């Protein structure tokens, strides 16, 4: 199937609202979370439009997928420095964690050649802890 010229550069109100949602949140978001944030800018925005735009932004390289083991995929701005994630078990939000443990590849031992790694910590975020305190 041939791409329409300029399709990847298409910038609609919906696309702008979805981009703004990621920039304002500054953390990985699920499509439902994107919808909730972007609807403040574009009334009547639907989940199908969010999915279409997420796919287009992935193709453009503006977004990157974050696959959580045993969980749903969330999305974040691409081009960030190497980092890891924290998943809140209470509210299901995902947060970026800066930095990396030095020599983490040594955990694999000598039998394996590590090409890359992803670390996800699970627990309760500060907002949820404050509610239960």
Task: List where the protein language model places each region.
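Short amphipathic alpha-helical elements of helix-turn-helix/winged-helix folds
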Residues: 17-25, 37
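DNA-recognition alpha helix
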Residues: 30-43
